[in-house]
């Protein structure tokens, strides 16, 4: 191949609208070969510890992720090399033994809460996007999602938010906003900001030859 792939990082707190922004990018570039990689499939393999111990892990902390593996995979995709992407079992809190063979694409979107935390990973991105949404809105979205899709009780969601999600957001996620090239208020509802972002991606695509 002669073209160099473009890597777009999309981050923000839980419930900020990252997925909506990512979907908007994918829809806009549907005529291109595009790949979305979620950071949370790169949680560490925890097959060596018990299920009870896995439940105690703080999954909103940078150390929960196998960032070295993610960096090596993004670097390989930029070289148009095939990777063996992990498959994460969200019910067992560890990786499955199987992997997904992933071919490189023209546009690579990396989505996750902590993708801007490590400079090595930031340096592999052409565009860094932070989806900035009010804390109350993010909490309500997370509450409704976890109760509806994951069978959680209201009390358990609130407890996790106050004890883990909110402090980790304030300590690790919010500070990465300063590394973003583009900040999108109100997530996927901000169509003007998304249009500006996709225009920038198109401009870079034309230069990546």
Swiss-Prot record:
Top-rank taxon, per record: Bacteria
Enzyme class name: transferase
Keyword Cytoplasm on entry: yes
A single GO molecular function term of this UniProt record: cytidine kinase activity
Residues bound to ATP: 12-19
One of the GO BP terms on file: UMP salvage
HAMAP family tied to this protein: Uridine_kinase
Family annotation (InterPro entries): P-loop_NTPase, PRK/URK, Uridine_kinase, Uridine_kinase-like
Gene Ontology, cellular component aspect: cytoplasm
Organism: Listeria innocua serovar 6a (strain ATCC BAA-680 / CLIP 11262)
Similarity comment: family membership: Belongs to the uridine kinase family.
Protein known as: Uridine kinase
């Amino acid at each position: 191949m002669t073209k160099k792939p473009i890597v777009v990082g999309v981050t923000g707190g839980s419930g900020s609208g990252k997925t909506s922004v990512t979907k908007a990018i994918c829809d806009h570039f549907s005529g291109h070969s595009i790949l979305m990689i979620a950071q949370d499939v790169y949680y560490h393999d925890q097959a060596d510890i018990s299920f009870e111990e896995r439940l105690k892990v703080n999954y909103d902390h940078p150390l929960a992720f196998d960032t070295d593996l993610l960096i090596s995979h993004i670097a390989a995709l930029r070289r148009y090399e095939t990777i063996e992407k992990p498959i994460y079992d969200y019910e067992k809190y560890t990786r499955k033994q199987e992997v997904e063979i992933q071919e490189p694409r023209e546009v690579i979107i990396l989505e996750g809460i902590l993708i801007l935390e490590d400079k090595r990973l930031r340096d592999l991105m052409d565009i860094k996007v932070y989806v900035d949404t009010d804390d109350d809105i993010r909490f309500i979205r997370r509450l409704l999602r976890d109760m509806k899709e994951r069978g959680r009780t209201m009390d358990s969601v609130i407890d996790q938010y106050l004890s883990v999600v909110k402090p980790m957001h304030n300590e690790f996620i919010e500070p990465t906003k300063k590394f973003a090239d583009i900040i999108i208020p109100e997530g996927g509802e901000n169509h003007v900001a998304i249009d500006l972002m996709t225009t920038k991606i198109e401009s870079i695509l034309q230069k990546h030859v």
